Structure formats: structure tokens, C-alpha cells
UniProtKB/Swiss-Prot annotation:
Upper taxonomic lineage: Bacteria, Bacillati, Actinomycetota, Actinomycetes, Mycobacteriales
UniProt pathway: Cofactor biosynthesis; (R)-pantothenate biosynthesis; (R)-pantothenate from (R)-pantoate and beta-alanine: step 1/1
Protein name: Pantothenate synthetase
Native source organism of the sequence: Corynebacterium diphtheriae (strain ATCC 700971 / NCTC 13129 / Biotype gravis)
Catalytic residues (UniProt): 38
Top-level taxonomic group: Bacteria
EC number: 6.3.2.1
Residues where beta-alanine binds: 65
Location in or out of the cell: Cytoplasm
Single GO cellular component term: cytosol
EC main group: ligase
Encoding gene per record: panC
Subunit structure: Homodimer.
Sites where the protein binds ATP: 31-38, 153-156, 190-193
InterPro entries: Pantoate_ligase, Pantoate_ligase_C, Rossmann-like_a/b/a_fold
Amino acid sequence: MTSITHTISEIQKLTRQAISDARPVVLIPTMGALHEGHLSLVDTAYSLELDNPFVIMSIFVNPLQFAAGEDLDSYPRTLDADAAKLATHNHQVHAIFAPSPAEMYPLGPRTTITPGAAALRFEGATRPTHFAGVLTVVNKLFQITQCQHAIFGEKDFQQLALIRQMVADFNLPVHVHGSPLMRDHDGVALSSRNAYLSDTERVEARRISAALRQAAMFHVKHDIIAAAINAMAGMDIDYIDVVAPDFSEPTAGNELYGDARIITAVKVGSTRLLDNMAVNVEKPNA
């Protein structure tokens, strides 16, 4: 049976007991409105083959990561439906932590994390306060739950890289695991914001993953990007690029070759959609 907790003291009581029982604590942070992509994070937690893990899913629409004019107020909040989905999933979530903003920030967000240079590009350029909010709440969740493992989806690839950076820079005793990006039957990357799309916009959104698949057939960085842009001609592309898995910037003598990601954000109607795909970058022929 899944416990639903709303206070820090409640979830800490459960995690203290789990730690006392020598059970590894696994945290899956989400904002709710669960879909199959979120459920796959639970499957990833169990794929770690830990001994009797205590699995927590946090469901919290974090106001710190939304800027003025974004969809904080309209973001779907479906705790009862989320709990029902978890109850019927084939792998158990032992506790849901669903705090209020007042519970997480009783005196307001007085102390926040500055993510650094890697957060200034791509999502950070469009949403300059976003990653400070993400890293602040993730760090709080790590401290509250005292988790040893945390699962994050690879759809938000820049976010995953920044969380790994924070863990390394702050020497946090947490193993961060990426869970593969999940797609719907039509190839669209699973996202809670897909619910905003009209039927016509949904058809348009399919072009994004199709473009990335076409781009991944190429191996020179310029050709990869050009193929994706051509395949998404006429779409409202925010950014598209090929990046290192850790989002480090290539330098002279240390160019990006080998395993990489093509990442993009595209606006379809009023909805910004993120997607990415693994690519292999080779040196161009002389």
C-alpha cells in the first residue's frame, strides 16, 4: 500500500524507518500529472536491483521553476488520479510526498542555488530562472528524504546534466540515474504538457521526433543539425543543437566527437515541447 504524505515530518518519519531497516531510499521527483513516462521512472528504480528499496515519488508543482507568465496556475494537478495510476502499476511506490508550497517554502525561497554557466544556454536562455528553481527544490528533496538514489527522465536532458553537476559539486551522497525518454505510439515524447495540444497541433508535434530520427542518420555535427532544421521547416524552433552528455562546451583541441545528443525545443501552438535523441558525432572528412 502506498502512503500519501503532505508534510516533511511525515515523509522523514518513513525514510528514517527505511534507513533504520537498511533499505536503500530511492527518490523519483515529479510534478504529477503522471503518464507512462513517469511510470517508466518507477521501472528504472527497480531495474537497479537494490535490496528491498524504499521508493518515494514526490509530486510537487514547484513555483520556483516557473517565471511570470508561464503555466504555473494552469499546470495540471491530479493527485488522486496519480495515486490511482501508481496503485495499479506493476512496481510499487511505497510513499508519495505531495507537499504544498507553504510546506516546502514556509518563509519563502530565501536560499537558492545558482546553477552556473551550463544553465545559461538552451532552456536557461529562454527561461533564465528555471534551473535555479529546479536545483533548489531537488536539493531540498534530497535533504528531506536522505535518498541514496534518484531517478530523472532523459527527456529533460539539460536538467539531468545540471542535477548531476550539482551532486558532484556539492559532494552529495546521491546516485543520479537517467531513465530513457519515452514516446507515445506516434513518436511524440511523453510530457504532461502534451495535454495542451489540439488534435491539429498533435499531428504537427509528430514532426519533431521524425526530424530527430532523420538527423540521427548523419554523423557530422553540422549535417545533423541541418537535417533536423530542414525536416522541421516552418516550425517555431526555439533552439536546436548537438551537445555533449554533460553539456560541457567544446574547446579548441577538445571538439565534440563520439556519443552526443541532439536537443531541441519547439513551440507548437502555445505549447513548448522538448525532445532529444542520441547521436554519434564523427570528424568531417578533410
